[in-house]
């Protein structure tokens, strides 16, 4: 039994056919006079495409195979090591520190240092741009580490503040004499003074000033009002 022939394979087209005609929509008019040239041009172009494919297959089959530069085991080992180090689904150790120039995950669009302030990303692939940006960033970090840092006082011309010596009034209030600055600690007296001797009120040491408090430490106005009452 013979196979049925494909419809519309031979020209001319059956009169009254109103189905799809290739390239007919690109013509000036869609009349029946344009149907036969469109189908004929489509068949010729399809035949040329088939001949080109056959020629390409013949040339590929006749081309001698390339010589491998390494064995298949080496290629598999390299792929295994790469997947072991950089595959995003593998569990990594927390103590393992990956290099900064690690190849980025395909599709990752995160932050890249020095990417927007330099021209490393112009007319280059993303991996090349990432490698250049990371390298420039590492160079800047190493340069900053090697730079000699000046101290704060030398950078801003600031001199260290000298400790102030206690004034004579503070020493007098503490019962010390300015002539013996080494006995400035609390509870210490100069060697010339007797620790058992009674000490006068601190207000009496200033002859030019009058004492404004009585024995009980109250102002004179309050003490006078209390005595009159």
UniProtKB/Swiss-Prot annotation:
Which keywords appear in this protein's UniProt record, sorted alphabetically? Cell projection, Cilium, Cytoplasm, Cytoskeleton, Flagellum, Nucleus
Cite the residue spans of the region called Disordered: 181-201
According to its UniProt record, where is this protein located? Cytoplasm, Cytoskeleton, Flagellum axoneme; Cytoplasm; Nucleus
Pfam families reported in the protein's UniProt record: SPMIP5
Question: What is one process in the GO biological process aspect for this record?
Answer: flagellated sperm motility
Cellular component per GO, a single term: nucleus
Report where it is expressed, by tissue: Expressed in testis (at protein level).
Do the record's keywords include Nucleus?
yes
Q: Cite the record's note on assembly.
A: Microtubule inner protein component of sperm flagellar doublet microtubules.
Q: What does this protein do?
A: Microtubule inner protein (MIP) part of the dynein-decorated doublet microtubules (DMTs) in flagellum axoneme. May serve to reinforce and thus stabilize the microtubule structure in the sperm flagella.
Name used for this protein in its record: Sperm-associated microtubule inner protein 5
Organism encoding this protein: Mus musculus (Mouse)
Q: What is the lineage of its organism?
A: Eukaryota, Metazoa, Chordata, Craniata, Vertebrata
Q: Gene name?
A: Spmip5
């Amino acid at each position: 039994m013979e196979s049925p022939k494909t419809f519309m394979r031979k020209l001319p087209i059956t009169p009254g056919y109103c189905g799809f005609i290739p390239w007919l929509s690109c013509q000036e008019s869609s009349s029946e006079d344009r149907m036969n040239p469109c189908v004929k041009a489509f068949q010729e172009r399809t035949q040329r495409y088939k001949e080109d494919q056959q020629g390409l297959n013949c040339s590929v089959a006749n081309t001698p195979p390339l010589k491998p530069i390494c064995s298949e085991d080496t290629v598999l080992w390299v792929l295994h090591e790469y997947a072991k180090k950089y595959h995003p689904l593998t569990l990594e150790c927390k103590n393992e520190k990956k290099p900064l120039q690690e190849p980025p995950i395909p599709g990752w669009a995160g932050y890249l240092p020095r990417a927007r302030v330099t021209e490393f990303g112009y007319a280059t692939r993303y991996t090349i741009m990432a490698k250049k940006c990371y390298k420039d960033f590492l160079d800047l970090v190493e340069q900053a580490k090697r730079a000699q840092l000046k101290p704060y006082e030398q950078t801003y011309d600031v001199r260290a503040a000298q400790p102030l010596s206690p004034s004579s009034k503070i020493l007098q209030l503490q019962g010390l004499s300015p002539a013996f600055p080494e006995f400035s600690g609390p509870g210490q007296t100069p060697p010339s003074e007797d620790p058992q001797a009674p000490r006068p009120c601190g207000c009496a040491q200033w002859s030019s000033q009058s004492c404004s408090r009585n024995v009980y430490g109250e102002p004179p106005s309050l003490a006078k009002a209390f005595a009159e009452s």
